[in-house]
Regions:
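Conserved ABC nucleotide-binding domain
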Residues: 76-77, 135-156
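Conserved ABC transporter NBD signature motif
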Residues: 66-75, 86, 120
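Catalytic Walker B motif of ABC-type/P-loop ATPase nucleotide-binding domains
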Residues: 173-177
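The feature captures the beta-strand-to-loop junction immediately N-terminal to the Walker
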Residues: 43-45
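Helix-to-loop junction immediately C-terminal to a conserved catalytic motif
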Residues: 58
């Protein structure tokens, strides 16, 4: 397991995680830790198990073996929305906003059903409205607050997806392919948003195929190949790893 952690232990600790689909081994004996405040890139060729790993960690899928601890608490038995209420959130590769709701109301839903569902938390209507406005400002969508998702460009839709995830007030955010299909300048916009979120205290794991973006954002890389973790370390060191070179370039 990686040594990256805080004095109080890692924010996320995974040991021996495995997942099968019938006879197919999707993940095998995955060990990893994520420390509070980190910016981690999770990379690997198509079919390497990245999405399956994220789904297991976020509660969409159930791992057959191993253990997942979030802030020291076992979460293997919790489903996705229960993990989200603890502070473990994700954005999706294919954004699925509420198409009949404007942007403010798209953010109001996770605030009401995640943040307000936490013990001891209750945001007033005024606080919810203020937080929605703050989130839209953070992703440069304040001028679209009353618009519907269908009115957004592709990069704006990506920003809305991130804002919806951040509305749950996560401590750890998995950003899954947040830049897919974007132009180089739009990729830079999303990197800037993610960096701001990290500076505000959100630990982020970026799952991404655009290596320029991964290298620009990440302070650490994890590499999956064929359901196994083959590298974990500083970006420049990982990219010089012979196993990683073979995985991407072949023999």
């Amino acid at each position: 397991m990686s040594s990256a952690q805080t004095d109080n232990g890692p924010l996320l600790a995974v040991s021996g995680l495995g997942k099968r689909f019938g006879g197919f081994v999707a993940l095998e004996n995955i060990d990893l830790t994520i420390a509070t405040g980190e910016r981690v890139g999770l990379i690997g060729p198509n079919g390497s198990g990245k999405s399956t790993l994220v789904n297991c960690l976020c509660g969409t899928l159930r791992n057959e073996t191993g253990a997942v601890l979030f802030d020291g608490r076992p979460v293997d038995g919790l489903i996705a929305h229960e993990r989200t209420r603890l502070g473990l959130a994700r954005s999706f590769q294919l954004p699925k906003p509420f198409h009949t709701l404007n942007l403010i109301d798209n953010l109001r839903v996770p605030l009401l059903y995640t943040v307000n569902a936490r013990p001891g938390h209750h945001l007033s209507d005024e606080q919810v409205a203020a937080r929605c406005a703050e989130l839209l400002e953070a992703v440069a969508l304040a001028d679209k607050a009353r618009r519907l998702p269908r009115d957004l460009t592709q990069v704006e839709m990506r920003k809305l997806e991130l804002a919806r995830a951040v509305a749950t007030e996560p401590r750890l955010l998995f950003a899954d392919e947040a830049m897919a299909g974007l132009s180089p300048s739009e990729v830079e916009e999303i990197i800037a948003v993610l960096l701001r979120l990290n500076q505000q205290g959100i630990t982020i794991v970026l799952i991404e195929h655009i290596m320029r973006a991964v290298m620009s954002f990440s302070t650490r890389l994890l590499v999956l190949v064929a359901g196994q973790k083959i590298a974990d370390g500083l970006p420049q060191e990982v990219m010089r790893n012979p196993e990683v070179e073979r995985a991407y370039l072949g023999e």
